[in-house]
Amino acid sequence: MLKDITIGQYYKEDSLIHRLDPRVKLFAVLIYVITLFMHKAPATYVMSLLFLIITIKISKVPVKYILRGLKAIAVILLFSVMINMLFIPGKPVIQFWIISISAEGIRTTIYLGSRLIMLVLGTSLLTFTTTPNELTDGLDKSLGFLNKVGVPVHEIAMMMSIALRFIPILTEELQKIMKAQTARGIDFESGGLLKRVKSMVPIIVPLFVAAIRRANDLAMAMESRCYHGGVGRTKLKPLKYEKRDKIAYIVLFVFLAVMIYLSFFSPWR
């Protein structure tokens, strides 16, 4: 399960998506998330899925690597499916004892499940194709206007970047601890759910200690380099829009217009 946690990890590749300005990719994620919650017809789900598939193909990130991240949300997805199928009222199509599953429940489950899957895959693609430094610069530039009203944009962007960077680091640390505990005879794989949960208890304290140690090392490194926020900082590689970024913006606005039409004006809605 631990090796399936891919969120926050950067996949190094030379693709058009990787070369896009991080501000474009942040805007793309925003547009994609907004359109996911606009879905009102099967055509909108098909369009969102098609857009995601094309983007993944262009990014050159292996499909297996991207889909691996879905295992981390399998429990949430399963819980959502069960709740919607069992508790949404309607004309029953499956009746067993006190369990009743309606056509509306099945339809809602399919819609919500596909929406959650596309949401996770779409947002994960941002971290797969954008380094933490690029993500920080992109957020800093995109939300820079909030500095005028006293919002510490650079600090917020830095915290988000550090949090994303810590996910794979802590995952690696957890794997090391589990291997050490396995060498001492603890079995994490066999047994029921309750037994597996109990077997995880001995690794909680070492993991917290490792996390605190890593955070302290990072704080000392930043302090030794005289980090004092974004005031007066310069960039080694300043962000600059290229022709491909402008074309990407046009594609995103066209996609948004199509989704608005399919959601509110199309005869298929």
Residue ranges of predicted features:
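Membrane-helix interfacial "entry" motifs
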Residues: 14, 37, 60-65, 96, ...
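Transmembrane alpha-helix interface motif
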Residues: 1-44, 48-57, 144-151, 155-158, ...
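Alpha-helical transmembrane segments and their membrane-interface exit regions
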Residues: 51-61, 76-79
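Juxtamembrane/interface alpha-helical elements of multi-pass membrane proteins
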Residues: 74-186
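Transmembrane helix-loop junctions in multipass membrane proteins, especially transporters and channels
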Residues: 41, 45, 60-64, 88-96, ...
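Alpha-helical membrane-interface segments at transmembrane helix boundaries
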Residues: 67, 71, 107-111, 201
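Alpha-helical transmembrane segments and their helix-start/interface "positive-inside/aromatic belt" motifs
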Residues: 25, 63-74, 248
